[in-house]
């Protein structure tokens, strides 16, 4: 079992296929997704990787958070989450995951906080039909109707569907298809809609109901060494061309 990723919802667009069909997609961005910590069986009692994404100003962090990111030697992150993995799915602290972690045609489960709708009535929140438009109904056209029975049980049962706060719930959408990936820009294009508002953080994991493709990288799709912060190779002195003198400069 391999790790998921943290992605930011950027919005929706459409992609045209080779046969002329256009597919509605949600664009997800992977912003500096790095391993912040490891959880190991002998020390923590379970196996997981802790990922961080985005960037945060140090002045906006608490002292424990600054120490946590400093120990991992990664820049402060705006969002942190853990993903359970198998023993062979552990990653080194500081490793950065790219959009190549997923492949086109793969199915994923996406978890996020749904859009908040505020205080909503029964018709909007639960799809109630409401009361009649005429025939003696006044003012109560969009009301709930009856909420109980009679003297027995003499109460309204818990979890009765009523008006109340709607949305802003942690929800998971399953079996969403990855239509396309863009590793250079760190983008995932997912077919259809996903939970949450623009700019919200999402957890993207391999589908639990549909097996991942065999060509999906394991344990993860990491950014190549060429894109890392490693020091550039030194150029021999004899190969370095001397700068040419131009007008206004001393040769």
Curated annotation (Swiss-Prot):
The modification N5-methylglutamine is found at residue 151. Gene3D superfamilies: 3.30.160.810, Translation factors. Residues 214-251 are annotated as: Disordered. It comes from the Bacteria. Keywords: Methylation, Ribonucleoprotein, Ribosomal protein, RNA-binding, rRNA-binding. SUPFAM superfamilies: Translation proteins (SSF50447). One of its GO terms (molecular function) is rRNA binding. InterPro entries: Ribosomal_uL3, Ribosomal_uL3_bac/org-type, Transl_B-barrel_sf. Transmembrane segments: none annotated. Methylated by PrmB. One of its GO terms (biological process) is translation. Residues 231-251 have a biased composition (Low complexity). GO terms for cellular component: cytosolic large ribosomal subunit. The keyword Cell wall biogenesis/degradation does not apply. One of the primary rRNA binding proteins, it binds directly near the 3'-end of the 23S rRNA, where it nucleates assembly of the 50S subunit. Belongs to the universal ribosomal protein uL3 family. Part of the 50S ribosomal subunit. Forms a cluster with proteins L14 and L19. This is Large ribosomal subunit protein uL3.
